[in-house]
């Protein structure tokens, strides 16, 4: 398949991140030609006020809450769910005690779509479920932030490794204008300092290195002392066992993002229940 052949070429050259950014810039140029900014701004105003991420994470954290990352495929794992139903997954996981949903919208490597984001948010609203929906993508341009809001996002998930200082500033200004929370992925103390200097208060300690796609299980413990005490802190990167959830709890983080292992499970809600989260403390009722 052409998608995977491009990825394979990047893997062989050791240019994972560079290939992703190159492809995303080309995609952005195409999207700007077909999506009118004025129409997106009108769409953005049609959604309810965004749900702040802080609203669903107790502070200080008593136990980490689970966040589900929804995607059909991943470049380092291949196809995760041949029959991918993001709305069905979202509703099953919401009933299972999930705190928030991150919907991957990158098409080239994850087989995502902006329409998946909107469909998930609409389904939650119809059932009056107050779960934040996060747009996960490779953010490079404020236009993507406007897209996120226009398709129902409450928050965006960005990676500092992919952004220049001016690029980060532009994204933060756009998110503030749209009322969106920003989750910033960090892997180094330098990136933590960048986030701190920009006043960012929601961070993801990412165990996966975007340059190699390898996972470093020890990274959160190394990075935790550098993370601001006042920040909302989540962990991500191939978390798959009750032991890893217990380790996250010991670090005092607010949440854990569950990705490929969750999506490979035949019954994701049952798999979630077996991870040892204290879900009974956080079960949400439908508003009424």
Where are the language model's segments positioned?
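Catalytic cores of alpha/beta
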Residues: 140-152, 187-199, 230, 235-258, ...
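Hydrophobic faces of well-ordered beta-strands that scaffold small-molecule active sites
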Residues: 1, 66-70, 101-103, 133-136, ...
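An N-cap/entry alpha-helix motif that binds or orients negatively charged groups
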Residues: 1-83
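Short beta-strand/loop segments at the ligand-binding rim of alpha/beta enzyme cores
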Residues: 64-66, 120-136, 174-183, 226-236
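Glycine/Thr-rich beta-alpha phosphate-binding loop at enzyme active sites
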Residues: 70-81, 95-112, 194-224
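Glycine-rich phosphate-binding active-site loops on the catalytic face of alpha/beta enzymes
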Residues: 99, 103-105, 147-167, 204-213, ...
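C-terminal helical cap(s) of enzyme catalytic domains, especially alpha/beta-barrels
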Residues: 222-226, 249, 262-288
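Active-site mouth loops of central-metabolism enzymes
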Residues: 7, 69-85, 131-140, 181-186, ...
